[in-house]
Amino acid sequence: MALDAAKKREIIARYQKHENDTGSPEVQIAILTERINHLTEHLQVHHKDHHSRRGLLKMVGQRRGLLNYLRENDVERYRQIVESLGLRR
């Protein structure tokens, strides 16, 4: 369930802090959110795909960890990313 390169570049361009930024928490959270949304749609059709469900739970946990890190270190950036991605928190 990987993102295609064009979609990934678009997400990176939208959330990066500077030209070469591909690993900031905001970028990682945005990419994970897109992958989670894609996998959620897949699981609604293929509800017995437990292997993908495990991958989804792993990605959700990874995103949760990044969000916790961002909240502890920069609350304003945390609030911006949660609002822009429409995450519940």
Swiss-Prot record:
Which cellular component terms (GO) are annotated to the entry?
Answer: cytosolic small ribosomal subunit
Cysteines joined through disulfide linkages: none
Which GO terms fall under biological process for this protein?
translation
One GO MF term on file is: rRNA binding
Source domain of life is Bacteria
Q: Which UniProt keywords apply?
A: Ribonucleoprotein, Ribosomal protein, RNA-binding, rRNA-binding
Q: How does it assemble?
A: Part of the 30S ribosomal subunit. Forms a bridge to the 50S subunit in the 70S ribosome, contacting the 23S rRNA.
Which protein are we looking at?
A: Small ribosomal subunit protein uS15
What species is given as this protein's source?
Moorella thermoacetica (strain ATCC 39073 / JCM 9320)
Task: List the lineage, top down.
Answer: Bacteria, Bacillati, Bacillota, Clostridia, Moorellales
In the UniProt record, the gene name given for this protein reads: rpsO
